[in-house]
Curated annotation (Swiss-Prot):
The keyword ATP-binding applies. GO terms for biological process: thiamine biosynthetic process; thiamine diphosphate biosynthetic process. This is Hydroxyethylthiazole kinase. One of its GO terms (molecular function) is magnesium ion binding. It comes from Histophilus somni (strain 129Pt).
Amino acid sequence: MNSQFLTKLRQRNPLIHNITNIVAANFSANGLLAIGASPIMSACIEEMEEMAKLSQSLVINIGTLTGKDVEAMLLAGKTANQVGIPVVLDPVGVGATTFRQKTTALLLEQVQFSAIRGNAGELAYIAGVQWSTKGVDAGKGMADIAEIAHLVARKYQCIAVISGETDYISDGKRLAKLNNGTPLFPKITASGCLLSAVCSAFLAVAEQKDYFDALVEGCSAYAIAGEIAAQSLSSTQFGQFTLGLLDQLASLTPEQINQYARISYE
């Protein structure tokens, strides 16, 4: 591929507003700093409108929801739409509880998302496709993952990103399949949450017409950083991988993305 967005991200250092969960907040902030963005972590409803006007992108992550969070998410999302910055939804464990289901439905009804990023089980639920999930984990299903990505992208007029052993990215017409990564990703908590934040950072430096390409590069960059970090590690070195991932996000170059990205288009 021809990396275009990583250099822009590091030059512009976009401010990314994260309404995320208590498990992921620290890791997401450090990961954004590593790749070249500037994170701000706030779910305080009193400052949501101002945050949207200060930021270049917004991530809404439902991982550890409270009632107050929902109000803040809705206000932040609607204000972000008004000022014209991209919004990413990470519907963590959406199928697990009624509260998550109702919250996600409300968000999708009232906020226009630029991208929705989750695992296969989460996006299958949003697409209305039968899937067996386990809490916030992907679970298993017989449906075609590429078709799920297309369904979500078309239904919500956004870019759908389904992450897993293979990542699927769809804008409703085009489909990219990314084959980088490492089995260590699902062994550390919040690796998907950080990916959503990275997606938001890449969208922050892209024109709307280029969102698909920006997310293909952003997801590839993240997966390649993980792949490089895992090269000298055993399958049980979770802690070393966590630190190594941050190091590789910081040192990753456009040339490495171009060299190592394994992408197919349909």
